[in-house]
Amino acid sequence: AKVFWFSTTELKHLALGALLVMGVGLFFIHQIASNIQELMTTEILVILAIVFTLSFLLHELAHKISAQRFGLWAEFRLTMQGALITLLSMLLPIKIISPGAVMIAGPMTKESAGKTGLAGPLTNIILSTVCTIIAVTTQNTFLWIIAYINALIALFNLIPFGIMDGLKVFWWNKMVWAIAFGASLPLT
């Protein structure tokens, strides 16, 4: 399988997924930043919603690239249920961002499934850690929020339940799962 190749269908699904995530992002950012006066400008809220969307896209692309490196077919697809839940969560106090997922086909092993599942949350853990380190040294509130968003994305996805990334990682290697989950906890 080609690494970092996108079909027209996948690009359409990624674009629609990104729009849904950005919508939730605007509501979520407004919710968490409402007590921070300097972040309550329209420009800052939009920038944070874009960063939120990029964090989601990088998470999904990490899954895709990881699967493709294992020689598997991998493309992002919207799901009707996920898109509706994501859309509805704009109006709910709890935000659920799951407009779709990277669909993977081919002969997967427990290891390739686990490593591919880990790739998304690990990307968010790295982004959160880098932003936290810079935020600590610069006292930049904007970076704290980006770090927090990425930590939440990682933590939520590492829950070892159902179709979550965490279950694939847990089945593959419980120690790796514990380290990843443990790394995301203090970042939140």
Regions found by a protein language model. Name each.
Residues A1-T188:
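Hydrophobic transmembrane alpha-helices and their immediate loop junctions
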